[in-house]
Amino acid sequence: MTKYRVLSIDGGGIRGIVTAVMMQRLAARAGLEGFLDQIDLITGTSTGGLLALGIAHGLDLEEIRGFYELDGPKIFDDSWLDDLLDLGKLRGADYKTAPMRRVLKRILGDDTTLGQLKKRVLITAFDMDNEDPDEMKRTWKPKLFHNFPGAGNDRHELAYKVGLYTAAAPTYFPSVDGYIDGGVYANNPAMCGLAQTQDTRYRPTPSMDDVVLLSLGTGASLFHVKGKTHDWGYVQWVKPLINLMLDGISGIADYHCHQMLRERYHRLAPVFPPEVSIPMDDIKKIPYMIRFAEELDLSPTVRWMKRHWMAQ
């Protein structure tokens, strides 16, 4: 049996620092050295897409952690003047694309394509207009950027641009070339990655029995709505609906992967304490998130990896 190892990384904005620190700690554990080298496919959404591109490009985890610690404040840099011009964040995205573009060009290269990456990747985005000349086929649709061989791939796409596409979270950043954050349909892209392993257009296709999948979250806050009946309209629903849908999407992907892979699937999705809520742009919480990730009990994940990921 030849294992096919898939790493899936959720979206979560600046909370990606939690994932970066968790991966650092895992890579430092005895018996797990070089676990990233064994990856066959990395799939990611939003900040998870940036992590996936960085790993596939060959960046070490210290560089990737530095991206969040040093460059995060530049990317999520907002001023009172920007807010004023955007009418208190009611018009226009919160942040400009230019700082993230500069950072991604620096770390991924100006002209590095997906085809030049050292690992297979599957990066989620959403195409706002497929521009099909047939009006009966013109629509918006999910887009999965990948560098698998064969027809229909995206090997020519610039890596930094794909990073911009997957990270263009609505209200936070403008769309880029008509694409927005894949988190609108796959904030947890694990099922996307699993499905990609079975695409018969790309040979050889691994047996499902050979696939092992490690899914990493970025740190979650728990939400709930009290009561049993909610006769609400738009105003009441708009605030909880986004978190409700993102959590639902993530949860159903977790369910599907567990049902299909059983013990060959593992999800590491840490939850912040009940009193802690961290928006995806809260750069002031970076020190807290680092401490949080450094104190997590990773022993269940370490045991699973030694048994299913590292073992031949």
Which residue ranges define each predicted feature?
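Patatin-like phospholipase
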Residues: Y4-S8, I14-L104, K161, A293
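Conserved small-residue
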Residues: G12, G48, L104, I123, ...
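Active-site gating loop/helix substructures
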Residues: D77, D83, G115-D199
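C-terminal helical/tail subdomains of lipid-metabolizing enzymes
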Residues: M1-T2, T171-G178, V184-A186, T205-M208, ...
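Short helix-terminating capping/connector loops at secondary-structure junctions
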Residues: M1-T2, E33-Q38, L114-K118, P204-D210, ...
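Conserved beta-strand elements of beta-rich interaction domains across eukaryotes
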Residues: G11-I14, T47-L50, G58, M128-N130, ...
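Extended hydrophobic secondary-structure segments that form protein cores and membrane-embedded regions
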Residues: V6-I9, Q38-S46, V121-F126, M208-F223, ...
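Surface cap/lid and interfacial helix-loop subdomains adjacent to catalytic sites
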Residues: L85-K89, A93-R120, L144, V176, ...
